[in-house]
Amino acid sequence: MSEGDIINLPKLGLNIRILDVPGHTSGAIAYYTEKMLFSGDTLFTAGCGRLFEGSPTEMYHSLSKIKKLSDDVLVYCGHEYTVSNLEFASTVEKNNKSIQKRLSTALQTRKLGQPTVPASLKIEKQTNPF
């Protein structure tokens, strides 16, 4: 599958678009609907994936592509790294109150054994340093 391909699931009322998002790996793809993005290991909550096969330029372009999506899109990423990513983000953007607030909420959420995923693309744009 590659950019522009569509998976139609009529019984679920879903048309899932494929986005090419290299960076973490050279062949990474994401699955996108009007309301959801399954980003795999390209975009995490408050972070992004390591560069295993892709280049920094590829990752930059992939994250820029994702950033153009609607703020209302919910991001479902491949791992639950929110707390550690926010701890890092708080060292990069020390004066970002949104990061501090989100970190506090994420710590409480995880303490209760609840997931912090999904997160809206809007909150990602406010708190993700990448």
Regions found by a protein language model. Give the residues of each.
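Catalytic core of the metallo-beta-lactamase
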Residues: 1-93
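Accessory terminal helices/loops
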Residues: 64-74, 83-130
